[in-house]
């Protein structure tokens, strides 16, 4: 077994911990050895409890999930007469967990990349774009699933539009804007709307490149906390950010 050697406060949540354990074992994320991963995860939880640290409920929920998956995989296969005409591949008990891990990994990598861009642009100022079109007709937009790729595509399109407006760059020291501050700003802007709803690009108006990146990171964090949703009526249509009329606690 791999030696447990890490700080209890080093992880953002149970999925972050699982990715760390999988990386330590150097195993395929699509073929997780549930017995070993579950044992190490439970050792981590027990260590936190022995140190009299508060164990967040989400860690305990994941512990129960891992134990359930481990139990299913240890159950003996029933020997049944096989009808090869109707045979379907048996669902892997790990599939749902792997899907959550991959989605979290994509968000984490995207956030890391954007933070690197934020650091690169921290000493630059970009002239705001001219003549931004206002095309929101107030029509109710039906909710569809919006992927991280859809959001990154919309964000990159907005950056290209700023570039086409020929921003003037000058090296200056700018006031640092934290993600928490931008989260408050986004929620405040949404709460000012009657239906707590804004078109995606309206959250990024009159901002520098640095502020754009921070705003996008803030939006991802708000989605993670389920304080906002991003919706799209159909493929290639505008994205809308829907607030839930709540404040950050």
Curated annotation (Swiss-Prot):
UniProt similarity note: Belongs to the ScpA family.
Descriptive protein name: Segregation and condensation protein A
GO aspect biological process, one term: cell division
Localization of this protein: Cytoplasm
Self-association state and partner proteins as the record states: Component of a cohesin-like complex composed of ScpA, ScpB and the Smc homodimer, in which ScpA and ScpB bind to the head domain of Smc. The presence of the three proteins is required for the association of the complex with DNA.
Gene3D superfamilies: 6.10.250.2410, Structural maintenance of chromosome 1. Chain E
Alphabetically ordered keywords of this record: Cell cycle, Cell division, Chromosome partition, Cytoplasm
Organism: Listeria monocytogenes serovar 1/2a (strain ATCC BAA-679 / EGD-e)
A Gene Ontology cellular-component term: cytoplasm
UniProt lineage: Bacteria, Bacillati, Bacillota, Bacilli, Bacillales
Superkingdom, taxonomy of origin: Bacteria
Function: Participates in chromosomal partition during cell division. May act via the formation of a condensin-like complex containing Smc and ScpB that pull DNA away from mid-cell into both cell halves.
Pfam families: SMC_ScpA
């Amino acid at each position: 077994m791999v030696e447990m050697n890490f700080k209890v406060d080093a992880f953002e949540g149970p999925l972050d911990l699982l990715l760390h354990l999988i990386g330590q074992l150097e195993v395929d994320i699509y073929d997780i050895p549930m017995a070993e991963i579950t044992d190490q995860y439970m050792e981590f939880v027990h260590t936190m409890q022995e140190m009299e640290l508060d164990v967040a409920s989400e860690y305990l929920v994941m512990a129960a999930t891992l134990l359930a998956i481990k139990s299913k995989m240890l159950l003996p296969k029933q020997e049944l007469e096989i009808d090869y005409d109707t045979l379907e591949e048996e669902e892997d008990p790990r599939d749902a967990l792997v899907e959550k891990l991959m989605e979290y990994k994509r968000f984490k990598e995207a956030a890391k990349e954007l933070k690197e861009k934020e650091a690169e642009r921290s000493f630059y100022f970009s002239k705001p774009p001219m003549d931004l079109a206002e095309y929101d007709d107030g029509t109710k937009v039906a909710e569809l699933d919006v992927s991280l790729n859809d959001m990154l595509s919309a964000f990159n399109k907005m950056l290209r539009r700023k570039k086409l407006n020929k921003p003037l760059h000058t090296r200056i020291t700018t006031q640092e804007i934290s993600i928490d501050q931008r989260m408050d700003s986004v929620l405040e802007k949404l709460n000012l709307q009657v239906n707590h709803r804004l078109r995606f690009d309206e959250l990024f108006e009159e901002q520098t490149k640095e502020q754009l990146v921070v705003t996008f990171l803030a939006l991802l964090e708000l989605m993670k906390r389920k304080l906002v949703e991003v919706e799209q009526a159909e493929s290639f249509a505008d994205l809308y950010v829907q607030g839930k009329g709540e404040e950050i606690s």
